[in-house]
Amino acid sequence: MKMPAKTGKEYMERLKQAKSSVYIHGEKVEDVTVHPAFRNVVRSMAALYDRQYEKPEKMLYRSPTTGQPVGMTFIQPTTIDELIARREATQEWARMSAGMMGRSPDYLNAEVMAMGIANDLFAEDDPMFAENAKNYYEYAREHDISLTHTLIHPQMNRAKALHEQNDADVPLHLVERRKDGIIVSGIRLLATQGGITDEILVFPSTVKKATSGEDPYALAFAIPNNTPGVKFICREAFDYGRSAWDHPLASRFEEGDAIVSFENVFVPWERVFVCGNSSICNRTFRETNAVVHMSHQVVAKNIVKTEFLLGVTLCLIEAIGIGEFQHVKDKGAEIMLVLETMKSHLYRAEHNAKRDRWGTMTPDFAALDAARNWYPRIYPRLAEIIRILGASGLMAIPTEADFQHEEIGDIVRRAMQGATVDGYERVQLFRLAWDLTMSAFGARQTHYEYYFFGDPVRMGMAYFDGYEKEPYKQFVREFLRGAKSVFIPADNKH
């Protein structure tokens, strides 16, 4: 009997059969599972789904509706133990990519769960929309749907609202309401893994708030990637077809990012969650607690990523014998401090978790919000530390082919030897550090983490505005009043 949780083979077969409209390097892709730009990351994604059956006790749970095994990352946690179990499944997947896959399936699985359970916000417009969110969660869970999403509009004139643009039809907008659904047209950014998933979620920004004048652009829906009129226009691939030795990360985990074009796309009503209501869009992520559960996944993933960065740093230090230098230890300590701080945020978030009014065990958002605001600001420094410590060794890095060449192989092996490793091992390590921080893939990782939840400055403003400030101001006022009451004036005679 077929199980709802899919295998890697089933994931790839779905992509083959879907034949979504995917474009890259000026050509239309016939089959993403074999195209050089996608085939390796598709196999990395397939490995994630295979892991569900390799470790079913960690990666699967019984569906509350069918009793069959479904993905643990879809679970609605109702206890702290279940919350931790979901996080452990997230980190199991994260370790398979060293945290490099920012849009592994668990990220959007958490969003779909939260909005499907806390669906009454969508009913403010029409009870149908709440029912749609609930049904979509069950559908995604029971069919193990892989998802990409798009939250932002094209960068046109950021000084103007969407409806004030010179070409106001470029951003994705509502064209027509029909008895059976809606017609939408326009462009959205930035669909990571666009074209290599089953479906796409179109949702409002998590940070930028819309005005009532932007109601035609206020949409939330989910449709298959192969819906007529949908095109994924992918950026240049950073997987250049090189070996996993030369490009150990890019050759396996290059997710890709895409512009998504909607050309008079029909969306049936049962797939619509918000239609022309900027007020609901502005409140969607916070009032459903979706941002809390998504942040829980992100912090868990970033802990794994930081563990990997620390491991690379320590191996690099050991390889070239720089471990006794004062500044080297200090830089290593910086990464250790980031790791332990992130772990502390996660522990507090999980152990202070409380059930929300829908019965979902919800992590302490104060801890997660601090972590998700801080990590984008500190990640560039972590990458910088590796670059500083690697120094010229990250520039003079031969390829594996150089070691195999009969004339120069021995020269390279001798020239590249380290304190504790031979030349071959040292270059392999340094190529990893380079791909992590300096290659096109590595530079994209730094940029991606910096803007993960949106503009860090805009996020910081929102964090400041939402922070409970009064207790701290009152603390100071009471201190000053107390100081005044016990103050004894100096005796002028002395």
Swiss-Prot record:
One of its GO terms (molecular function) is 4-hydroxyphenylacetate 3-monooxygenase activity. One of its GO terms (biological process) is phenylacetate catabolic process. Gene3D superfamilies: 4-hydroxybutyryl-coa dehydratase, domain 1, Butyryl-CoA Dehydrogenase, subunit A, domain 2, Butyryl-CoA Dehydrogenase, subunit A, domain 3. Substrate binds at R103, S104, P105, D106, Y107, H149, S205, T206. It is an enzyme of class 1 (oxidoreductase). Pfam families: HpaB, HpaB_N. InterPro entries: Acyl-CoA_Oxase/DH_mid-dom_sf (IPR046373), AcylCo_DH-like_C (IPR036250), AcylCoA_DH/oxidase_NM_dom_sf (IPR009100), HpaB/PvcC/4-BUDH (IPR004925), HpaB/PvcC/4-BUDH_C (IPR024719), HpaB/PvcC/4-BUDH_N (IPR024674), HpaB_Deino-type (IPR012687). It comes from the Bacteria. It catalyses: 4-hydroxyphenylacetate + FADH2 + O2 = 3,4-dihydroxyphenylacetate + FAD + H2O + H(+). Its EC number is 1.14.14.9. This is 4-hydroxyphenylacetate 3-monooxygenase oxygenase component.
